[in-house]
Amino acid sequence: MVGEEKMSLRNRLSKSRENPEEDEDQRNPAKESLETPSNGRIDIKQLIAKKIKLTAEAEELKPFFMKEVGSHFDDFVTNLIEKSASLDNGGCALTTFSVLEGEKNNHRAKDLRAPPEQGKIFIARRSLLDELLEVDHIRTIYHMFIALLILFILSTLVVDYIDEGRLVLEFSLLSYAFGKFPTVVWTWWIMFLSTFSVPYFLFQHWATGYSKSSHPLIRSLFHGFLFMIFQIGVLGFGPTYVVLAYTLPPASRFIIIFEQIRFVMKAHSFVRENVPRVLNSAKEKSSTVPIPTVNQYLYFLFAPTLIYRDSYPRNPTVRWGYVAMKFAQVFGCFFYVYYIFERLCAPLFRNIKQEPFSARVLVLCVFNSILPGVLILFLTFFAFLHCWLNAFAEMLRFGDRMFYKDWWNSTSYSNYYRTWNVVVHDWLYYYAYKDFLWFFSKRFKSAAMLAVFAVSAVVHEYALAVCLSFFYPVLFVLFMFFGMAFNFIVNDSRKKPIWNVLMWTSLFLGNGVLLCFYSQEWYARQHCPLKNPTFLDYVRPRSWTCRYVF
């Protein structure tokens, strides 16, 4: 190879000596365009035409070049992740990537889904938005949202100054939404301490005596029954009772209910992942019982994942500046949502004239609610799934930051459900979908998917009903019926861009419907209260019969 390179180099040198004029022309390709006519002036039109031609050729080659580079880069990253996973997970990773081997044509197979018996594989990786925000074009979109927030603030200040004759720097809506916060704090501490102690104690007590017990089945049923009582009674009814008994405002209720659901899912994952290990240990008659340490369980309770592991990939250091920035962005999103409600939502519903509930009022309300609904959707995603989870991941040096994927590129609802919230999807996939198939049969995949949709829809509707103090199953209908239908109709076989457009259109419309219906019902119950409401009054829509001015 070296000899061939030397010979080719000598041939080129000899040819350059034989044809010095040709070599000179090759080294000066612009000489022809810069030749001056007899009058000594450069032909500007010819120079501009040459430049335009070169620019057009470069633009024509640009997409092919970017596509080729992107393809090779995806291959490189995929191979690198495979090698890293094989080093970290041994045989488990080999099994996983043998499944992915059949997807060679898919260069973006980033979910690294392990077989059900192996569970989720955690790999150190950054969040997608952290990578995208390093690109100037994407960062400009982020700057546009900041500029829009500044305009919201200026608009509020100007309107208040014109109406009141002074600057009104009040956040009455924000202070009302997060009212009675001390109750939230002590309720959270009770939930945390009970989740930290009861599941771990029950599991430890069951595991240490399981192999020596003369009645292991009765022992397992007894401890399982106690665990169910804790999940349903303590974590289930306890926080709900506090929320209703102390009449907490909406945002304070949301914090408690969200943490309630999170602790229930965490406790279930801890028991679900460790019970099979104890059973296998007893089956193999091992002298040691695989019981996690208290520190491992405590770390899991704060880690931004719902899948328990004894250890996770960890980053070497904590970037406290990064943590501060993420928390600042979370608070910025809170104020952003406040100004959206103050400038877009409140005037919309306050200015609806006194007229009965009709299709005309409903249609106008839905389409006027699309813009604020979509903005709230984006801000919720950015504040929680990106900023909040990344802040805790950085403080805990948690390495796997794939809390979401590129859901905005989805051409099907099935892909959207998988990529919008990876944290919750992983829990539903392994502990609801896969366990359903294991318990019944692998032939009932449609029934398993239906069960997962039902569980998710019921939990979402429960959270909204408790937080808003009324039952109005709009989200349940959209999620359980339309969402499930779209999941089967607009499936993964849809790859054309038009399906991405349709997905975004339906997503925009759905958020407008949710914001319109729930806001109308909220204002109706505020302005048309009942003296002695019965249970049916909490589930009967008040906005359909109440005539009032918002």
Curated annotation (Swiss-Prot):
Motif segment (FYXDWWN motif): 403-409
Pfam families for this protein: MBOAT
Cystine pairings recorded for this chain: 528-546
Keyword Membrane included in the entry's annotation: yes
Keyword Secreted: no
Effect of residue 456 to A: Abolished cholesterol O-acyltransferase activity
Name of the protein in question: Sterol O-acyltransferase 1
